[in-house]
């Protein structure tokens, strides 16, 4: 992950699901010389307002997703989707593409892209994400992040003995 952060010069982090959001497992700052995104180790990233949360809901346990969708969702920015219908649309888009992407939904000037990593049964158990100031999330940068994250997701899953579901592979090929 450190290599990924250095290559992109952006914040890369892995997170695991908890009852109320995604808990930071590891982070690496790519050292961009200008404005940076920061995360505190104690932060809990909300499922509905972060790419990590959306990716987890898209590829995680369906029962967990159902329970999460039934809970209250606070509005963090004017871009935060709080309706169940909007959230289900974001989840479906992530399933179709193999990744979740958000723009100014948790913090006003932050965009991010996340993908799941999988356990030995092929279920998502966490996410790997890149967060960047929104001004740097150009279409070219997003495409580059997606390519590098797909490699990182597969490598991380393989390193923990995970099985990559064919539906995830197909989504990445189609995206």
What spans do the regions from the language model cover?
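Intrinsically disordered, low-complexity terminal regulatory regions
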Residues: 1-29, 144, 148-152, 156-175
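Amphipathic alpha-helical effector-binding/dimerization core
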Residues: 1-71
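Generic alpha-helical structural context detector
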Residues: 54-58, 92, 154, 158
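Short, hydrophobic secondary-structure boundary micro-motifs
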Residues: 67-68, 103, 165-166
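Short intrinsically disordered coil segments
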Residues: 71-73, 145
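Intrinsically disordered, low-complexity polar/acidic regions
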Residues: 76-77
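Extended hydrophobic
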Residues: 80-152, 170-172
């Amino acid at each position: 992950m450190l290599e990924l952060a250095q290559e992109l010069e952006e914040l890369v982090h892995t997170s695991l699901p908890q009852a109320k959001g995604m808990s930071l497992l590891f982070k690496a700052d790519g050292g961009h010389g200008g404005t940076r995104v920061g995360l505190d180790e104690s932060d809990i990233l909300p499922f509905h307002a972060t790419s990590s949360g959306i990716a987890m809901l898209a590829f995680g346990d369906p029962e967990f997703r159902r329970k999460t969708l039934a809970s209250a969702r606070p509005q963090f920015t004017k871009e935060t989707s709080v309706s169940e219908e909007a959230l289900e649309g974001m989840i479906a888009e992530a399933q179709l593409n193999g990744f979740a992407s958000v723009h100014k939904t948790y913090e006003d000037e932050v965009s991010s892209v996340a993908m799941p990593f999988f356990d030995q049964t092929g279920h998502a158990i966490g996410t790997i994400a890149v967060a960047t100031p929104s001004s740097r999330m150009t279409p070219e940068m997003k495409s580059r992040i997606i390519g590098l994250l797909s490699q990182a997701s597969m490598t991380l899953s393989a390193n923990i003995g995970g099985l990559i579901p064919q539906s995830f592979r197909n989504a990445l090929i189609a995206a």
